[in-house]
Amino acid sequence: MHNPPHPGEVLLELYLNPLGLTITAAAAGLGITRKALSELVNGHTNVSRDMAIRLAKAFPHTDIRLWLDLQSQHDAWHAEQRAEAIDVKPFAMPPMETTV
C-alpha cells in the first residue's frame, strides 16, 4: 500500500484550491480559527470527529465517514511503518474451538 495523503492535503487540493477559497475564508465558513485550519492542511493536526462534521456540512457531496476514513487510512499506514521497530512478545493464544 502507498502512503495515503493526509486529509488536510486532500482538503486543500480537491476542495479549497478548486473553489478559490483562502485558508482565512474557509476557516470562517467552518467556524474555526485560521490557525486550526492551517495546521490541518499542513498535516500538523488530524481530522477530529468535530472537524469531520464541519467538513461534511461545508462540502455536502462528502460525508463524515469520508473525512474520518481518510484520517484512519493515513494513520494506519504510518502505524504499519513503525510496527517492526516496536518490540513486543506475543501472548500464546488458546486453541480455537470449532463448532459444527
Regions found by a protein language model. Give the residues of each.
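A short, basic/aromatic helix-end/turn motif that makes direct DNA contacts
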Residues: G29-I32, A56-H61
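Short alpha-helical DNA-recognition segment
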Residues: G20-S38
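Short, charged recognition helix plus adjacent turn
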Residues: R65-V100
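Short, basic-rich loop-to-helix N-cap that marks the start of a DNA-contacting helix
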Residues: H44-K57
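A short, Lys/Arg-rich alpha-helix, primarily the initiator
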Residues: M1-L21, L66-D69, V100
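The DNA-recognition helices of helix-turn-helix-type DNA-binding domains
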Residues: T33, H44, T62, Q71-H74
